[in-house]
């Protein structure tokens, strides 16, 4: 498990951390009732894909129809900021330490890896949601679904 050192990041580091979290989190329907990440990742991916073209379309449409430049630029900037807001939220969430209930579940999943004879890197710091994402991604690939019974 190659986990980066998670420190309280600045704005751009938080966006990069959010992008890593977006790519790491396993979007599984069993996790949807417990974690808001599935909905946030889906909305952020939608925003990354469709908001820049929508921003360009609204900008050119308002200018072509003789609208003012100020509102056109404001609308385009707002549309482009939506995916950044999602990445920022994901980055903030990724750096958040796990609450006690999830911390216990985190260590239970690690224990199931040990029982299965699968080696894991030792936990160096307080586990964060990014650590949980790495662990869950690996668990969905290498363990049976019994680790979800405690969710």
Curated annotation (Swiss-Prot):
Record key words, sorted: Cell inner membrane, Cell membrane, Membrane, Transmembrane, Transmembrane helix
Keyword Cell inner membrane (UniProt): yes
Topological category with respect to the lipid bilayer: Multi-pass membrane protein
One Pfam family here: DUF412
HAMAP family hit by this protein: UPF0208 (MF_01101)
Family statement: Belongs to the UPF0208 family.
Name of the protein in its database record: UPF0208 membrane protein PMI1770
Organism: Proteus mirabilis (strain HI4320)
